[in-house]
From Swiss-Prot:
Annotated transit peptide: 1-55
Comment field (misc): Potentially represents an important therapeutic reagent for HLA-A24 patients. This antigen is recognized by tumor-infiltrating lymphocyte (TIL) 1290 in the context of HLA-A24.
Tissue: Found in a variety of normal tissues including spleen, testes, thymus, liver, kidney, brain, adrenal, lung and retinal tissue.
Recorded GO MF terms: RNA binding; structural constituent of ribosome
Keyword terms of this UniProt record: Mitochondrion, Ribonucleoprotein, Ribosomal protein, Transit peptide
Organism domain of life: Eukaryota
This protein's record includes keyword Ribosomal protein: yes
One family name in Pfam for this protein: Ribosomal_L28
Main location: mitochondrion
Cellular component GO terms, alphabetical: cytosol; mitochondrial inner membrane; mitochondrial large ribosomal subunit; mitochondrial ribosome; mitochondrion
Name under which the protein is recorded: Large ribosomal subunit protein bL28m
Summary of subunit composition and partner proteins: Component of the mitochondrial large ribosomal subunit (mt-LSU). Mature mammalian 55S mitochondrial ribosomes consist of a small (28S) and a large (39S) subunit. The 28S small subunit contains a 12S ribosomal RNA (12S mt-rRNA) and 30 different proteins. The 39S large subunit contains a 16S rRNA (16S mt-rRNA), a copy of mitochondrial valine transfer RNA (mt-tRNA(Val)), which plays an integral structural role, and 52 different proteins. Interacts with OXA1L.
Localization (cell): Mitochondrion
Length: 256
């Protein structure tokens, strides 16, 4: 007899179908349910399901098994390009007969300053060499953030940047270079392929807890009293009626 009514791996999906989670926008729920394989960073995939064993010439099945990666909290405040900590063990004195010791492999980190054309701001960010190479390949920070999917960014800071960029592109914010409209139009035209509706951009990069709080605040907005709605409608009707009726002009007698 099973211990649970539903398998454990289904609990998170079932949670999204109940309560306030079920009232979240459809595009946000789809982004949570999408499971994409991140780009391999710490291992090289075989690229095939079978290979020939050089010893006996037989075909053998091979499988790509990703190395477990631990992303510390500081990785969410920088751009590590998918790199993280690898937890493992090594032999003491490089001797297989001696005991094994715990070992943590960490990426080399650098602090660099980047400029965002869309946000018109400079950021000092902790990055890795892989991140610098990816930014160079994408021809700038903005293209790197907008092109890289969530599972490859692996950074809350990166997703917050993406949300800010998408919101500015969706709103065509005039606060960007207000003294130079031509430059502003050129920037918006340069990144127009990434523009999405503002209603979707507001939810990009939010965690489930942040999305639930946002939905709760939207639902708890103070309702407008009915008498204010009726008064506004009455005033509008009276204004339209006054404009539609012809004006009556009384002629005065010449002797008066």
């Amino acid at each position: 007899m099973p211990l649970h009514k539903y398998p454990v791996w289904l609990w998170k999906r079932l949670q999204l179908r109940e309560g306030i989670c079920s009232r979240l926008p459809g595009h946000y729920l789809r982004s949570l349910e999408e499971e994409r394989t991140p780009t391999p960073v710490h291992y090289r995939p075989h690229g095939a399901k079978f290979k020939i064993n050089p010893k006996n010439g037989q075909r053998e099945r091979v499988e790509d098994v990703p190395i477990p990666i631990y992303f510390p909290p500081e990785s969410q405040r920088g751009l590590w390009g998918g790199e993280g900590w690898i937890l493992g063990q090594i032999y003491a004195n490089n001797d297989k007969l001696s005991k094994r010791l715990k070992k943590v492999w960490k990426p080399q980190l650098f602090e660099r300053e980047f400029y965002s054309e869309i946000l018109d701001k400079k950021f000092t960010v902790t990055v890795t060499m892989r991140t610098l190479d990816l930014i160079d390949e994408a021809y700038g920070l903005d293209f790197y953030i907008l092109k890289t999917p969530k599972e490859d960014l692996c950074s809350k800071f990166g997703m917050d940047l993406k949300r800010g960029m998408l919101l500015r592109l969706a709103r065509q914010d005039p606060q960007l270079h207000p003294e130079d409209p031509e430059r502003r139009a050129a920037i918006y035209d340069k990144y127009k392929e990434f523009a999405i509706p503002e209603e979707e951009a507001e939810w990009v990069g939010l965690t489930l807890e942040e999305a639930i709080e946002k939905q709760r605040l939207l639902e708890e907005k103070d309702p407008v009293p009915l008498f204010k709605i009726y008064v506004a409608e009455l005033i509008q009707q009276l204004q339209q009626q006054a404009l539609s009726e012809p004006a009556v002009v009384q002629k005065r007698a010449s002797g008066q």
